[in-house]
Amino acid sequence: MALKYQRILLKISGEALGGEKGTGFDEPTMDAICGGVKKAHELGVQIGIVVGGGNFWRGRSSGKMERTLADQIGMLATVMNALAVSDKLEQLGVPTEVFTSITMPQVAPAFTRKEALHAMEEGKIAIFGGGTGNPFFSTDTTTALRAVEVSADIMFKATMVDGVYDKDPHKYPDAKKYETLTFTKVLEDRLAVMDGTAATLCRDNKLPILVFDLADPDNIARAVQGENVGTLVYEG
């Protein structure tokens, strides 16, 4: 099957790397997720990845800590995850390059659009750590920003549910799944796709989002080929 997308930006939550517990690194889960990324990469698609940091740090659970400091700790957690995902992919024979939004030359080069594009065009998976480099912005917003910067065709948001619902499907058996959505409806109805900043950035730059379940890592390759594996959000 031909590729529907030539360049994608994939968001993976930090909790996903922690398996059922959602903390630290769960090796079988890491193997499965990175194996799914490898299958997509072997199809010839250019891939960028943003990883969250929730398996190590949740800013909203930081108690009385000052928000800027809490977010900076979260940014460092995403760098740890970026390095871990890079290492796992390299073990599987997939070339990668990590970029950070926070200057730490002993760890990885700082992000620039030119270098990230060069890496992807060479067949490497570009992995972005450090969030946007600024507090008060989510990793969803980071993914949207990097996707726009590298001219990705689409943003893939790999989650723990198989798409977007009108209410929490884990709590409400009658929850309705959307096959497609517009950004306008997402923003007006405050649907749990991503935060408003990220959704607005995607809408304004005509960047579609595909939300799908990472429980089956093969969904990444299926999505690249245009299979219906989740909910497509676009600006109609």
Residue spans for each PLM region:
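C-terminal catalytic "cap/lid" subdomain
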Residues: 1-236
